[in-house]
Swiss-Prot record:
Signal peptide: 1-24
Its biological purpose: Toxin with unknown function in healthy organisms. On glioma cells, interacts with chloride channels (probably ClC-3/CLCN3) and MMP2 at the surface of glioma cells. This complex is then internalized via caveolae, thus inhibiting the chloride channels necessary for cell shrinkage and tumor propagation.
Species per Swiss-Prot/TrEMBL record: Olivierus martensii
Keyword Signal: yes
Pfam families: Toxin_5
UniProt name for this protein: Chlorotoxin-like peptide Bm12-b
Expression sites by tissue: Expressed by the venom gland.
Amino acid sequence: MKFLYGIVFIALFLTVMFATQTDGCGPCFTTDANMARKCRECCGGNGKCFGPQCLCNRE
């Protein structure tokens, strides 16, 4: 059982680490018509809304 808790802890830890490595752009709301533009500007011209998340391409 401790092994299972360890796996869950590692998965949660990696998820939090991945989330904190993003550039800190806010979520994409479908109610805002300018959300795609705001996401691009936040990411320095390389952002794209993917579902509720603004993802920055690191090129």
